[in-house]
């Protein structure tokens, strides 16, 4: 049995090649990979425009434009020479069965983490982060969350599968510690009593990158960190292809600098979510997501090279 069931089951939304043209490996548990990329083509929990199930394919497709650069600016080294990264394709589940997706994703993540691998996941809508957090918390214990988004996703509407409730549920399950967690780029209403430090888009756009990063490091401390990036954190001028766009967001330049600034954190898991290519223009949203994902891998490679 392969990693994800049958690698052809999701062929309507899957790719023939891996992210950045990295090797495809449908048996990553026994591989010597440091990081494993998993696509999660799921959008049943969205409250806005659907289409996030096509996000992983769009990110991989456009990533070929990034594969040529070896001594990537401004890092001046090739991530692939420091990290062993493989792409295991997309999670296979019965489309239409949100619970099965959640259970299979958590089981897949638990097996990878138990084998000593780290995960970079592509959504899919943001709900996919919750089963990933459950798996990571089993392995690493309670974590800090560094969360880029236009929305806090801390809404308590009682729905089991909703991409706006994960970070209300996760603290209650003991997966993350809100007092050591930061939400960056927020520009919609939220409950100020949830314990998270919220750095709204207005202040993040006005403050220096170094100042924001210093505050993030102070809040997170030395806890294990899960990094999640909802692409709607970016302004729709830079990322129109998403389900719930909100104007007044971060530029792609500011976002990439902030991600680079997280290099010294103890990041144990990462994801990029909410790319919906049906609403994209010239693949700029997918390109932003692919570039941010690549930068996430570079901050890991930079630490390994020290």
UniProtKB/Swiss-Prot annotation:
It is an enzyme of class 3 (hydrolase). InterPro entries: Agmatinase (IPR023694), Agmatinase-rel (IPR005925), Ureohydrolase (IPR006035), Ureohydrolase_dom_sf (IPR023696), Ureohydrolase_Mn_BS (IPR020855). Its EC number is 3.5.3.11. Pathway: Amine and polyamine biosynthesis; putrescine biosynthesis via agmatine pathway; putrescine from agmatine: step 1/1. The keyword Hydrolase applies. It catalyses: agmatine + H2O = urea + putrescine. GO terms for biological process: putrescine biosynthetic process from arginine, via agmatine; spermidine biosynthetic process. GO terms for molecular function: agmatinase activity; manganese ion binding. Pfam families: Arginase. Mn(2+) binds at residues 126, 149, 151, 153, 230, 232. Its cofactor is Mn(2+). Keywords: Hydrolase, Manganese, Metal-binding, Polyamine biosynthesis, Putrescine biosynthesis, Spermidine biosynthesis. PANTHER family: ARGINASE/AGMATINASE (PTHR11358), GUANIDINO ACID HYDROLASE, MITOCHONDRIAL (PTHR11358:SF26). Belongs to the arginase family. Agmatinase subfamily. Catalyzes the formation of putrescine from agmatine. HAMAP family: SpeB. This is Agmatinase. It comes from Shigella boydii serotype 18 (strain CDC 3083-94 / BS512).
């Amino acid at each position: 049995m392969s990693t994800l069931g049958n690698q052809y089951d999701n062929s309507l939304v899957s790719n023939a090649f891996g992210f950045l043209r990295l090797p495809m490996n449908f048996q990553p548990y026994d591989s010597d990979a440091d990081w494993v990329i998993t696509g999660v083509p799921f959008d049943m929990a969205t409250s806005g425009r659907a289409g996030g199930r096509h996000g992983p394919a769009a990110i991989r497709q456009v990533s070929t434009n990034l594969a040529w650069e070896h001594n990537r600016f401004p890092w001046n080294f090739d991530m692939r020479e420091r990290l062993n990264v493989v792409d295991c394709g997309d999670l296979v589940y019965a489309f239409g069965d949100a619970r099965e997706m959640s259970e299979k994703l958590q089981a897949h993540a638990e097996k990878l983490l138990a084998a000593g691998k780290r995960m970079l996941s592509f959504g899919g809508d943001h709900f996919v982060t919750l089963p990933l957090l459950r798996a990571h918390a089993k392995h690493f214990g309670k974590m800090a969350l560094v969360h880029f988004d236009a929305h806090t996703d801390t809404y308590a509407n009682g729905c089991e599968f909703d991409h706006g409730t994960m970070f209300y549920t996760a603290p209650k399950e003991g997966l993350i510690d809100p007092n050591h967690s930061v939400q960056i780029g927020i520009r919609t209403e939220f409950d100020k009593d949830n314990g998270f430090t919220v750095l709204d888009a207005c202040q993040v756009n006005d403050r220096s990158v170094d100042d924001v990063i210093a505050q993030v490091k102070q809040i997170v401390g030395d806890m294990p960190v899960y990094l999640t990036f909802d692409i709607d954190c970016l302004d729709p001028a830079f990322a129109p292809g998403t389900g719930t766009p909100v104007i007044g967001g971060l530029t792609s330049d500011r976002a990439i600098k902030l991600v680079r600034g997280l290099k010294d954190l103890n990041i144990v898991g990462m994801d990029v979510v909410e790319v919906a290519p049906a609403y994209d223009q010239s693949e700029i949203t997918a390109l932003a997501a692919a570039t941010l994902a690549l930068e996430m891998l570079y901050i890991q490679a930079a630490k390994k090279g020290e």
